[in-house]
Structures are given as structure tokens and as C-alpha cells.
Amino acid sequence: ELARQIGLSAPATADRVRRLEAQGVIAAFTVELDPRALGYTLQAIVRVKPLPGQLHLVEELLRRIPEFVECDKVTGDDCFICRLYLRTIEHLDDILSKVTERAETSTAIVKSTPVPRRLPPLVEDEHAHR
């Protein structure tokens, strides 16, 4: 399928993929699951600001809670911006209760995702438009 999409033969495509893997450009092949199909009908973005002296403990806590599917350490007033997949608002409350003992949180419920996670522009494409 990939070969057809990029207009190369299957062997040429396989060779290119192997080279990109060897160069570290392709880091992994993944499967994308639909969280809704697994019962996770709610998404939340949670900003987390650890209480004084709690930074490392909060970071470890966020790693251990599987509903935190991604979390970035950021600059600014908060230390972390995290995405959670949840089943209900009560589920959100249960998860946040584990965090609020050691951090302040600010939560936003995701209504929609107009720009889903995507790759940055490829270098070759960027030069082609100049």
C-alpha cells in the first residue's frame, strides 16, 4: 500500500524504509486505537502545578497513572500539560484526587480535535515550496 501511495516499487519502498529506520528517521511502527471503542468517551487536558518540593514525586505519579496518555513538562506557571482518556466525569474526579494531594490542577474537557496529532513538515517538502 505504501509503495502505491508514493509511486515506487515494493522493493524500492522496502529499501527506503530500511534506510530511514537505520538513520533513526523512523523511530517506530505503531497501531492507532480509537479510545472511544474501548469505552474512553471523555478526553481532558490537565495543567499540573506541583506544590513546593513535590515536582519529582508528581512527575513519577503522572507516569504511573495509565489514564495520563501523554504529558509534557513545560515552561510557564504550570509544570506539566497532560492529556487523559476517561470513561466518565466521576472517573476524572477519581484520577485527579490522586494528583491534587501533591499539585494544583486546572482541567479542560476536550470538545473536538480540529487538528489531530500529525507529523511536522518534512524537510524535503519545506524546500519544495520556496
Residue ranges and their predicted role:
Residues 1-130:
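A compositional/biophysical signature of low hydrophobicity enriched in polar/charged and small residues
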